[in-house]
């Protein structure tokens, strides 16, 4: 199945500083497509794929061309050129089971990436020590996850083994001010997590252990 939804969003902002005043309203429609695919190989084996898209709007404070210098050492400037972010999320599932062998397999994989994320760009004034921060769009934020599960019976089906393996990877980007070049560099942070859970059990007509 496939579908597309448009989600209306209404925002209002009132800003006043001295004689300067802004009173504005924003109305947008957020685009949110989705795809859901399922295929059944048999009664005990199936595949499923899911896709979701999500739009994220910049805040009104970030969009308006306002210079907030109420703190002279921490100045914030809005950015009217900010684009909405859009996140792609995909998930894949597969499972199968053999009743005769009492053996099952489960897999799950997912991936998510965001276009036009918002990160703060910061500039420093060496003479005054002031810091000016402006929100800007940035690309490169994504993550991936994978899981493999396996369980089976052994030796007259009195023993069972269960295994779950997980892997998770994160790739995050942000602006980082370079003191030497006086410009922002794209800073990347990555993280990898691996985990394994293995257990066994024994069962007979009298008791179960594990």
Feature annotation, model-predicted:
Residues 1-210:
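Exposed, low-structure sequence patches enriched in small/polar residues
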